[in-house]
A protein has these predicted regions:
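Extracytosolic ligand-binding ectodomains
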Residues: 1-118
Length: 118
């Protein structure tokens, strides 16, 4: 949670050039993310951050698991059996222990913004 907009806001110039690992690319152009982003902006009048994106992904994982196996009473078991879900920016894959695996990005703070290191 440390690499949020709040870090840049509070850190100011002191965090310029700082590198962080993140799962959220605020400039992602995927249609699924852009639709979510616009809906979020319309509703909250600000850009979605880490919390909004991961909460959306988590809710959709639960809803998809319930839709695919409505009679199953053990949600964790269902999620582990399905394993792979489409997130807003990249897949979310659960291992046998229930740990979520996502692609990570290396970002650097440039001009007060998080930018993906190519």
């Amino acid at each position: 949670w440390g690499a949020t907009e709040r870090l840049v806001e509070l850190g100011g110039r002191a965090v310029e050039g700082m590198s962080v690992a993140q799962i959220l690319d605020r400039n992602n152009t995927a249609p699924r993310y852009q639709t979510f982003r616009q809906t979020y902006l319309d509703r909250f009048q600000r850009e979605p951050g880490f919390g909004g994106v991961t909460a959306f992904d988590a809710a959709n994982i639960v809803l998809e698991a319930l839709a695919k196996h409505p009679a199953e009473r053990n949600l964790k078991k269902t999620i582990l059996a399905l394993r792979r879900f489409e997130g807003l920016q990249h897949p979310v894959v659960f291992d046998e222990f229930g740990e979520a695996r996502r692609d990570s990005l290396i970002m650097v703070v440039r001009d007060g913004q998080f930018v993906v290191v190519q």
